[in-house]
Amino acid sequence: MPRIYKIVGDTTTGMKFRIEVVAEKPYDAIEKAYSLIGSRHKLSRMQIRIREVVPISPEEARSEHVKILMAVDKIYKY
């Protein structure tokens, strides 16, 4: 069952980030964070430092997108 993970970190450019992702395992959440931050800000993995990965409840989530994903039972792709 997927869980919501809060990922906190910073980059070598001085930017701090807090991101919420839905993933099965903490490792998958870290990979998703590397992908999202890297693509949004054109950074490599070596430039991204992840400080904390914590599972959170759906009530604690700030992102509406994450809340909607957790509320859906099944996703169909056509």
Swiss-Prot record:
GO cellular component assignments: ribonucleoprotein complex; ribosome
Q: Which Pfam families match?
A: Ribosomal_L18A
- Which keywords fit this entry according to its UniProt record? Ribonucleoprotein, Ribosomal protein, RNA-binding, rRNA-binding
Q: Which InterPro entries match?
A: Ribosomal_eL20, Ribosomal_eL20_dom
Q: Does the keyword Nucleotide-binding apply?
A: no
Complex formation: Part of the 50S ribosomal subunit. Binds 23S rRNA.
Task: Spell out the protein name for this chain.
Answer: Large ribosomal subunit protein eL20
Q: Which organism is it from?
A: Pyrobaculum arsenaticum (strain DSM 13514 / JCM 11321 / PZ6)
